[in-house]
Every structure is written in C-alpha cells, then in structure tokens.
C-alpha cells in the first residue's frame, strides 16, 4: 500500500512539472474585498410569515381538540345507530310472545268465550266464578258438585231464617243472615246441623305463591279465605237466596255493601266479621279525594262493573299461571270496555304495557331501566310511541286516585278494624238489626 502511494505522489509531481514547463499561466492574484457580491441569505428559500402572539393564543389547545374528537365520535355513533335502526325496524316484534302453544292455555281461551256469552247486566256470579277457577285448574273441577254445595248452603240459610222468624222478603233480613253465616256459629236444631264461621287466612293471602289461594273453591274446602274469596262467596250466596248485595273496593281490599228497606247503606267487613263505618275505611290513609271522585273506591259496583272485575281476576289468573302475553291484553281490554275506570284493569294494563315496552326495547339493544341508554329510543319512533303509551297509562292510574299501599300498611289497617271502638260500633249495629227484625216478625 505504501509503495502505491509513493508512485501516485511521483506521478502527480511529474504532471505538475510538465504543466509549469510548457504553459504560460498567470498565477492568481489576491482578491479585494470590494469584488465580493453580497449574497441574500433568503435567496431561493420561501418566505415565512411568523405569526404574532395574538394568533397563537387563538389556536385550539389539547382539551378543545379532545372535545371535538369526542363529539365527532358521538355523532358517528348516533349516525350508525340510526342506520342500524332503519335496517332493523322491520325485524322488531312489537307484540309479546304468546303462550298459546302451551296446551293448558286452551282452557282459558274456552273460558273467555263462555264469559263473553254472559249478559253484562244480568249474569250468574256463581257460574262466572266457577268458569274462572276451573280454567286455572284446567277444567278438572265439577260444576255439579260446586252448585250442590251452594244450593245446600242456600237451603241452610233459608231454614235458619225461618227458625229465627226473619221476614225472608226483607233485604235486611237476608243480608243479616248472610253476615251471621260468615261470622258466627249457626245451628239448625231440628236437623242437628251446625256451621262454623269462616276464618281469615293469613297464609299467602295475596296468592303470590299459589293463585288458587284466592279462590272460592279453596274457601269452601278449608273454611279459610281472604278479602277476595270471602266477598265473592257472599255474593254467590246472596244470589242463591235472592238478597241484594254489592261488591265494593278500597286499597288492596274488597268488601260488601248492602242497603235496607229504608235506603240505609251498610258495610260488611268479612275478614273480621264486623260491620264497618265509612270513617274506618277512610282511616287507612290511602284513599285520596281523586279516588272518591272517580268512584274506584267505596262505591257499590253495578252488574257491568262487577263483570269487569271478574274479567280482571280472570286475566290475573292467566298471568300468574303463564305470564303476560296478547291473550292477557285481550281480556284486559274487555274489562276496560265494560268499566273504563276499573282500577284493577287499569293497573294490569299498566303492567302489560310496561312489559311490552321493555321487551321491544331490549330487541334493539337498549336497556329500558337505564335512563342514559333509554335516550337512544329516539332513533326508533315506534318504540317512542310505546313509551308514550306507558306514560299515558301511568298518568291515568294516577288521575283515578291510586296510591300504593304496602302489605305491611294493609295488615296494620286490618288490625285497626278490630280495635275496641270498631267492635263496639259493630255490636251496636247487630243489636239494631235484631230489634228491627223482631219488630217485623211481630207485625
């Protein structure tokens, strides 16, 4: 390598010597300062405008950029949801699934047809009650046996009235006899027949575990009942002996009203075997003025309204046995057709519409119980209509004067009916009835 560098050096030296020897070239002179041209430092470069401080302050900061991105993403999500809504609108099922494929539901459909054949202003509550309960038991009950028990009881009541010397043409006499049948021990000495009073059944009195706890057939079999079965049997027996009596409602409760020949009205509380004053019923604290104005509480029901109540009970039995489906809605609509202000039917309609709305909302991925998520239904006009229907129905229930009464409050109110003052008032009424009936017998 060193040898090659020496050779290269010698070659360059020889070339330089030959150049100097054979060419007359002037040696370069020292340049003067004045000969240099001033060069523009920006020559060939783009001109850049430097912004002032005010412009810099107006530029978006990191938080503003984040907010803009967040809004843009949210808008994109909403647009996607709208597209999704348009694509899936035709796939939404707006009706609750039917339980009609269950074999035992046929008994309810048959029972509905039987109830629909009844005249609204004149029907047999005995027959209607059997139809309703028999549907729940899948038509395994025997109407002839049920009718036999009712007739035998009717005969017992008539014989007892005759033994006591009551005028069986008087409505007061017949209702007082019915009251004693439910609340006292009765005997017919000539035939050695004895009847014990019915008792209030505190076990599952709302029928939550077993809906048949609410039935008249259960009351007749066990001698125990509650505020649904006791008044129902009273009306059945009143029908049997030709007494005029009416069903009336108060919060979570039903009782009997009847009037005597002087147009005086009386309240029969069968859960404790007493006559009850209007003031005692009002003392529950859950009867608002709106409820009295709308007539949902403390008013005697007409035949048409009573049939509506039976339809509501019928729908409740189906819903407890199977669940809410379009058949329940069909029955509720019939009940509301007969009695638009029925608080029982309106409450059931509220339940149905709520369940229907939640079912539809979940189909499009919306949690109906999440307020934030619920806002997304605006992309589904038909679902918005369902929600509006729910709210309208809730408003109607409120306008009728409904106020929720807890099970504890209800039990406390029932207990208050047994207080000394209430018992004294009831005993005084019984004395007055006996006096009136004895005077009639003497005449």
Q: Where are the regions that the model predicts?
A:
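Bacterial Sec-dependent N-terminal signal peptides
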Residues: 1-31
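A structural boundary/capping signal
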Residues: 24-443
């Amino acid at each position: 390598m060193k040898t090659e560098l020496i050779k290269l050096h010698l070659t360059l030296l020889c070339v330089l010597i030959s150049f100097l020897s054979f060419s007359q070239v002037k040696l370069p002179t020292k340049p003067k300062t004045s000969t240099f041209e001033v060069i523009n430092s920006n020559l060939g470069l783009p001109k850049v405008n430097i912004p002032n401080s005010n412009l810099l302050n107006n530029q978006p900061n990191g938080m503003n950029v984040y907010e803009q991105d967040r809004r843009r993403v949210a808008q994109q999500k909403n647009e996607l949801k709208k597209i999704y809504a348009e694509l899936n609108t035709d796939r939404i099922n707006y009706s609750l699934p039917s339980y009609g494929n269950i074999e035992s539901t046929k008994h309810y459909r048959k029972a509905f047809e039987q109830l629909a054949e009844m005249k609204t202003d004149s029907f047999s509550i005995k027959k209607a009650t059997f139809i309703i309960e028999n549907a729940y038991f899948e038509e395994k009950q025997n109407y002839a046996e049920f009718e036999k028990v009712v007739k035998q009881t009717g005969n017992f009541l008539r014989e007892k009235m005759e033994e006591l010397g009551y005028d069986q043409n008087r409505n007061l006499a017949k209702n007082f006899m019915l009251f004693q049948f439910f609340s006292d021990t009765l005997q017919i000495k000539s035939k050695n027949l004895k009847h014990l009073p019915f008792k209030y059944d505190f076990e599952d009195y709302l029928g939550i575990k077993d809906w048949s706890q609410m039935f008249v057939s259960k009351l007749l079999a066990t001698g125990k009942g509650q505020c649904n079965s006791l008044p129902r049997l009273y009306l059945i027996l009143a029908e049997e002996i030709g007494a005029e009596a009416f069903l009336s409602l108060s919060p979570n409760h039903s009782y009997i009203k009847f009037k005597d020949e002087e147009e005086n009205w009386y309240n029969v509380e069968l859960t404790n075997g007493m006559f009850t004053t209007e003031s005692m019923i009002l003392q529950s604290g859950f009867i608002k003025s709106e409820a009295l104005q709308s007539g949902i509480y403390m008013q005697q029901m007409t035949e048409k309204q009573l049939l509506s109540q039976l339809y509501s009970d019928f729908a409740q039995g189906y819903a407890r046995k199977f669940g809410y489906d379009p058949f329940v809605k069909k029955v509720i609509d019939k009940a509301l057709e007969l009695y638009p202000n029925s608080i029982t039917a309106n409450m059931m309609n509220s339940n149905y519409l709520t369940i229907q709305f939640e079912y539809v909302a979940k189909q499009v991925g919306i949690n109906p119980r999440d307020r934030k998520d619920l806002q997304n239904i605006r992309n589904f006009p038909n679902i918005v209509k369902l929600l509006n229907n729910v709210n309208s129905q809730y408003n109607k229930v409120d306008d009728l004067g409904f106020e929720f009464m807890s099970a504890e409050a209800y039990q406390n109110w029932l207990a208050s009916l047994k207080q000394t003052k209430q018992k004294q008032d009831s005993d005084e009424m019984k004395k007055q009835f006996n006096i009136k009936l004895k005077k009639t017998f003497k005449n």
